[in-house]
Amino acid sequence: KIFSIHYFEYMSNFSFAGESHNFWEFICVDKGEVGVTRGKSYTILKKGDLIFHKPNEFHDVKATGGIAPNLVVISFECNDDAMYFFNDRLLQIDETERNLLANIIIEARRCFDCRLDDPYLQNMPLKDPDTFGAQQMIKLYLEHFLIHLIRRYSNPIVLSKKLPKADPPKV
């Protein structure tokens, strides 16, 4: 279940007091930088950085006062053990993951009858009718995003400069 999808530009002095809830949430910085508290640790996130908040973890976010940051924030329920991969990690997204997030935002605009730039909005009403398949596409893009991250960080691809020599098949 997806609870919220937001894409917004904070003011350079924005401060969100913090919250905790019983579902997952992640923040990805599209531009600028923010300071994020999760539990007792504080981290500065810059463009391309991604951080997950596990269920019931207190977290807040504050603009650092420089460039007004643009953030993608998505909260969702997932009880799969694979989610433990994201505990206490700071990740950087690649171009594929950036495109998947962009696709989620596009589908959210087709699906939800509200602005995506209100960080305090809790309930996201559906459009009546929404674009065919928009909710399913959001779910698929989010699953693809999570799987891609786990695969990329678990099994980094090493590119060889030379292809190994092989004998042609014998006929």
PLM features per residue range, with description:
Residues C78-L100:
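Double-stranded beta-helix
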Residues N56-Y84:
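Ligand-binding loop in jelly-roll beta-barrel domains
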Residues L116, M124-K139, L146-V171:
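Short, Lys/Arg-enriched, Trp-marked, Pro/Gly-tolerant hinge/linker segments that flank
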Residues T96-L100, D117-M124:
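A general structural signal for short secondary-structure boundary/capping elements
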Residues L71, L101, I105-A108, I138-L149:
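Hydrophobic alpha-helical core bundles mediating ligand binding, dimerization, or RNAP-core interactions
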Residues K1-I44, L50, E57, G65, ...:
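Generic protein-terminus/edge-of-domain signal
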Residues F52-H53, K139:
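DNA-recognition element of transcription regulators
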